[in-house]
Amino acid sequence: MHVVLPDGKQLELPMGATALDAASAIGPRLAQDALAATANGELVDLMTPLPDGASITLITKKNPGDAAPLFRHSLGHVMSQAVGEYYRAKGYSDDRIKRGVGPSIENGWYQDFDLPEPLREEDLPEIEKIMREILSRNLAFRRREVSKAEGLAQFPHDPYKQELIQGLPDDEPITFYQQGDYVDLCRGPHFPSTGRLPGAFKLMSTSGAYWRGNEKNPILQRVYGVAFASQKELDEYLHQLEEAKRRDHRKLGRELELFTIDPLVGKGLPLWLPNGTVLREELAGFLKEQQFRRGYQGVITPNIGNLELYKTSGHYPYYADGQFNPIEVDDEQYMLKPMNCPHHVRIYASKPRSYRDLPVRLAEFGTVYRYEQSGELNGLTRVRGFTQDDAHLFCRPDQLKKEFLDVLDLTVLVLKTFGMNDVRFRVGTRDPESDKYVGDEANWELAERQILEAVDEVGLPYTIEPGDAAFYGPKLDFVVKDVLGREWQLGTIQVDYNLPERFDISYVGEDGQDHRPIMIHRAPFGSLERFVGILIEHYAGDFPLWLAPRQVMIIPIADRHNEYAEELRSELHAAGLRAEVDDSSNRMQAKVRTAELSKIPVMLIVGDKEQEARQVSVRERSVEGHKERKGVAFDDLCAELLERYRARI
């Protein structure tokens, strides 16, 4: 057999040769430094037989980060071994320690356990200590294949491993990996030995997780760890994590009184508090203004609909698992609205349409409901009830590209208005092997081609993601990177030839015949809840003036200045600005501190001098730090703030 090296040269090897054999054939130093390899683009360990003719790249200690998924997975096994040793030292037998799944994930790994007593967060440093001791033993990772019967016999007291093994094919070998006396069911691959693993790791947290994600199954304890090729990378990651905690929208949402989630109301159903409502309405107002300029018409639809509506659209039963169960009313079935588009189609169909009427652009901030498992709910970014900035455009074929480009322009404008300039674009197309898609083959091909033509025309960088399309049509997603470098999918545009067919809608063309319109789905924010959650973290709660729920705090130095402060508040309020007076008995420094903690962007301090001259001392928060100005004429400042507010800066 032979393998192909990165420089294109072929290396002859005996049949069944491994990556380690390839490294040894090149030279003993390379064999000593090798950690893993890629074969035809897939990571493999050094002991796995290579396919004949495979293109291989050897990964060495000079570039261990290239093998990050391997060393993270191997460290997961080391952690699992350490947990076993920890509980044995406490007097528990091995059959009391049961394990679920333990994959590598982004930046690390997790492992699910069923333990005789729960691990506490304060136990994790001790587990880390045992892990480092296991690394020092330099235990080899050994792969072996066994039959299904042998596999079941390996874990007689572990129902989770038994279930996993029972689900494997009878006629295929089962692979185990072993280091020292620890054995686990695993496909691999792994590092050569524990001594070759990086020491830049940390156990982060524990949580509960249903076995196999099913709420009817037992809750296991999930332990998370992270690992990097170097301590510098780990330190940078931990610093970023601390910054993410500081910006956590759930924490800031409470502190800034933006939203709350009340268990009596229900999980995943946020309540918008007055401050959060202001923020939400500013977002909606901004988009409505843009939509008005572009010829959109507002509509309102109910929060429930007849089940037949969603059967016609195809949302039911295609996404039945993600929707709330139907309810029966007057011998008919209804369900909470999972999407706005079928309702908008019926509005389009409510009267005859001519080619002269098109395009029809219908927009709504419509609340929809999806059933998310409770373990997946997360503040505002994963909820069960949310409001989409939904619009649906109905157009002729000759109008499609122009309408698509206009929607694309609007979405980019929205994102850049909020400082989200690092944007990439993702075109979701069909997976030809999947049967989840509905509609005519020719229409799918046409829609996919026209999306790509539109994106090419504006010169946007993009990737094509097969299988990422909606069930009714291809789409363009906008992926933004926030200040922490995290990527979020915000905004989507979808071309849909399918729903017009399913609902049999039409317009009368110039030829007097009925024609089928093309439909575009569009939501620049995606959902207001998720967008607000991301904005809170993007700005760390320090919103620009126009978005800030509390824009101006007037701070009188003494009680005798309260009347002047209230006069200024009244004038700012009349001008359309959100202003308050802190007339508490606290000292001025304490009032400033309170306003700082509330992240109010503008503070106006007034004392004797300011009152006599109708002036204010200004203290502003900004990303660059604090800016202070003294002796500013109030009328000039009011005009300045109003101009900034209207310009949305």
From Swiss-Prot:
Annotated TGS domain residues: 1-60
Query: Required cofactors, per record?
Result: Zn(2+)
Stretch list, region Catalytic? 248-544
Question: What does the Swiss-Prot or TrEMBL cofactor note state?
Answer: Binds 1 zinc ion per subunit.
What are the GO cellular component annotations?
cytoplasm
Q: Where does Zn(2+) bind?
A: 341, 392, 521
Compartments it resides in: Cytoplasm
Please describe what this protein does. Answer: Catalyzes the attachment of threonine to tRNA(Thr) in a two-step reaction: L-threonine is first activated by ATP to form Thr-AMP and then transferred to the acceptor end of tRNA(Thr). Also edits incorrectly charged L-seryl-tRNA(Thr).
Its keywords, alphabetically, are:
Aminoacyl-tRNA synthetase, ATP-binding, Cytoplasm, Ligase, Metal-binding, Nucleotide-binding, Protein biosynthesis, RNA-binding, tRNA-binding, Zinc
Name the SUPFAM superfamilies on file. Class II aaRS ABD-related, Class II aaRS and biotin synthetases, TGS-like, ThrRS/AlaRS common domain
Single Gene Ontology BP term? threonyl-tRNA aminoacylation
What is this protein's name? Threonine--tRNA ligase
What broad class of enzyme is this? ligase
Superkingdom of this protein's organism: Bacteria
Q: Which HAMAP family match?
A: Thr_tRNA_synth
Q: Which gene encodes it?
A: thrS
Write down the chemical reaction(s) this protein catalyses. Answer: tRNA(Thr) + L-threonine + ATP = L-threonyl-tRNA(Thr) + AMP + diphosphate + H(+)
The GO terms describing molecular function are: ATP binding; metal ion binding; threonine-tRNA ligase activity; tRNA binding
The entry describes its oligomerization and partners as: Homodimer.
Which Enzyme Commission number(s) are listed? 6.1.1.3
What CDD domains does the annotation carry?
Answer: TGS_ThrRS, ThrRS_anticodon, ThrRS_core
Q: Which InterPro entries match?
A: aa-tRNA-synt_IIb (IPR002314), aa-tRNA-synth_II (IPR006195), aa-tRNA-synth_II/BPL/LPL (IPR045864), Anticodon-bd (IPR004154), Anticodon-bd_dom_sf (IPR036621), Beta-grasp_dom_sf (IPR012675), TGS (IPR004095), TGS-like (IPR012676)
